[in-house]
Amino acid sequence: YLFSLDVALMFRLQCSKKYIYEESDLVHTYISNRWVQRVFEYIDKKIIKGSVLTVFTSQGFIKYHFKDDTPNNTIVVPNRLTPEILDYSIIPKDAINTSCIKFGFVGAVRFKSLYRLAETILNNFPNHEFHFYGTINSNRDGDFMELDKFQNCYLHGGFKNPQDLPHIYSSIDIVISTYDLVEENVKYAEPNKLYEAIYFETPIVVTTGTYLAEKVNELGIGYDVDAMNEKSVISFVNSLTQESLQKRIDGCKRIDKEKTLNLNKELFERLDNINIKQKNIHSIR
């Protein structure tokens, strides 16, 4: 079982044994030289096609490599919630008050687009609230601490996952999951925040122009916005109504909660089928 492109490449150079490959990041897209990036993309696709099975953590990664021509030896296993979350009861929420919407970010606080979106909301909508749950990255500490000057900004600090998630999501109306589009990887990734939003029936806001935005709109569970564009953010917030928010909440409710959990049933079934086929091949030989 090979994790990441660098490990898989070293393995392929040294032996010809069968392998299962997992890709959770498009690591070669971080290379600034486009020609080198293309070489590694060619190698990556060869490794994928040569595998017994390739496990992707996002359907977007398959789309990046192969457009709509998905190879048969691939499977998508997203970063869903740990089944341990079932040990903690979901806390019922009050109906959303559109005069005082509680926006929330849950996770490592570091992205510039998150700062810009939060600043725009805090500055232009003093009636709404913005809550941060998670530690602030040291590189962005100054920026985000500056937001504390707004009376409608709340920095809650770190939290325990998954123990604290029910309380956190019961305290917010909309969860923010916007990321900087500087890296190609972000455009195609599928963060676990998507599955938290569905599980806790909370509308999600993501970055326009990403695979995540496509999925959120397809499922009808949230909104996409250009977080770096002040006019876009203001227009988005002004467009929020009780009806549109309830429509997204209902979209979350329609999805079976089991599909948000990291149970890996499909993966185990595929692995079992591979083992059966391998045994049949050996018996024929």
Where are these regions (language model features)?
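Membrane-proximal helix-turn-helix segments that form the acceptor-binding/catalytic region
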Residues: 6-14, 21, 35-56
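Acidic anion/phosphate-binding donor-loop and adjacent secondary structure
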Residues: 31-32, 76, 80-100, 111-116
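A short, active-site helix/loop in glycosyltransferases that binds the activated sugar's phosphate group
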Residues: 45-76, 81-86, 214-215
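A short, histidine- and acid-enriched strand-loop-helix "catalytic/donor-clamping" loop
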Residues: 17-36, 112
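Nucleotide-sugar-dependent
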Residues: 112, 159-168, 175-195, 206-214
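Conserved donor-binding/catalytic core segment of Leloir-type glycosyltransferases
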Residues: 55, 94-113, 118-122, 131
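A charged, aromatic-enriched C-terminal amphipathic alpha-helix characteristic of glycosyltransferases
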Residues: 228-234, 241-280
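Nucleotide-activated donor-binding/catalytic signature segment of Leloir-type glycosyltransferases, i.e.
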Residues: 134, 141-171
